[in-house]
């Protein structure tokens, strides 16, 4: 099974086969071409493709080469967990995949924090259902916006600051971005716990490009899993393939990947 995660900045392509998930390649989303997707289709002529996209205009690059063997994730398909949300169609496919992986692989209550162009917090409640979340500007947007909207502030590389009290403009911007972002993440985690009425710690899983930089110094983050979204895409994909091929057993390796174990049930979005 080929797994595709089209985000605003980067598209990740993974392969799940014989119980193992591996990342095949990363492509800047703006540079996706038919040449690339047709090459992948020819390399894996028997594999189904599960598409998770938040950039609809890029879907065609996969739909044509994988015609007849493509499954797309959206809020109308069975996901494996309940969705408690007034208008599920508003939820991005990547957020759904993160919630599914979070609930089925890590347990609940829990929150997945995905650091990308935007940073999303997706919450799974005490019963394992997706119950909502938070969307914040991504870390890189903080520095790029200041650079674009001011006359003198430079565009800086985002990396770990050497100290908090900066002695240059570049370092001051870096401190504000990195440490300020950590403060936002920590505060929102505490507010989520408070709103859920949790007196004890719950599971926090971070993913996405900025997850290691931001979360490496946050004790409230339990796991950094850079493959979380692909894992969720894979779990939903198994459900979609099974429903289409009702006469076939689940493929080898399903439900768990190696080292995983979780209960399985089919839920639609309105349960």
UniProtKB/Swiss-Prot annotation:
Pathway: Cofactor biosynthesis; coenzyme A biosynthesis; CoA from (R)-pantothenate: step 1/5
UniProt keyword annotations, A-Z: ATP-binding, Coenzyme A biosynthesis, Cytoplasm, Kinase, Metal-binding, Nucleotide-binding, Potassium, Transferase
SUPFAM superfamilies per record: Actin-like ATPase domain
Binding residues for ATP: 5-12, 117
Known cofactor(s): NH4(+); K(+)
Localization (cell): Cytoplasm
Co-factor binding comment: A monovalent cation. Ammonium or potassium.
Record: residues binding substrate: 85, 92-95, 169
Enzyme class, spelled out: transferase
Active-site residue numbers: 94
Keyword Nucleotide-binding appears in the UniProt entry: yes
Reactions mediated catalytically: (R)-pantothenate + ATP = (R)-4'-phosphopantothenate + ADP + H(+)
GO molecular function, one term: ATP binding
Similarity comment: Belongs to the type III pantothenate kinase family.
Summary of the function given for this chain in its UniProt record: Catalyzes the phosphorylation of pantothenate (Pan), the first step in CoA biosynthesis.
PANTHER family found in the cross-reference section: TYPE III PANTOTHENATE KINASE
Assembly behavior: Homodimer.
Protein name: Type III pantothenate kinase
Naturally occurring in which organism (per UniProt): Methylacidiphilum infernorum (isolate V4)
């Amino acid at each position: 099974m080929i797994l595709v995660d089209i985000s605003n900045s980067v598209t990740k392509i993974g392969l799940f086969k014989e119980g193992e998930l591996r990342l095949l390649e990363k492509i800047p989303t703006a540079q996706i071409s038919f040449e690339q997707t047709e090459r992948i289709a020819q390399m894996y002529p028997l594999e189904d493709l599960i598409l998770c996209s938040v950039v609809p205009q890029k879907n065609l690059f996969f739909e044509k080469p994988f015609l007849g063997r493509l499954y797309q994730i959206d809020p109308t398909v069975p996901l494996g967990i309940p969705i408690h949300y007034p208008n599920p169609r508003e939820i991005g496919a990547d957020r759904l995949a993160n919630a599914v992986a979070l609930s089925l692989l890590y347990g609940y209550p829990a929150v997945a924090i995905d650091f990308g162009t935007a940073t999303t917090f997706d919450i799974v409640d005490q019963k394992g259902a997706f119950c909502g979340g938070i969307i914040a500007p991504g870390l890189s947007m903080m520095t790029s916006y200041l650079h674009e909207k001011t006359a003198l502030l430079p565009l800086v590389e985002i990396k770990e600051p050497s100290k908090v009290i900066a002695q240059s403009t570049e370092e001051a911007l870096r401190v504000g971005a990195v440490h300020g972002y950590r403060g936002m993440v920590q505060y929102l985690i505490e507010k989520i716990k408070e709103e859920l009425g949790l007196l004890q710690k719950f599971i926090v899983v971070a993913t996405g490009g900025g997850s290691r930089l931001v979360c490496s110094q946050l004790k409230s983050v339990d796991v950094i899993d850079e493959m979380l979204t692909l894992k969720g895409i894979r779990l939903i994909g198994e459900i979609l393939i099974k429903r289409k091929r009702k006469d076939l057993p689940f493929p080898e390796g399903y439900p768990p990947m190696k080292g995983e174990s979780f209960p399985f049930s089919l839920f639609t979005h309105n349960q």
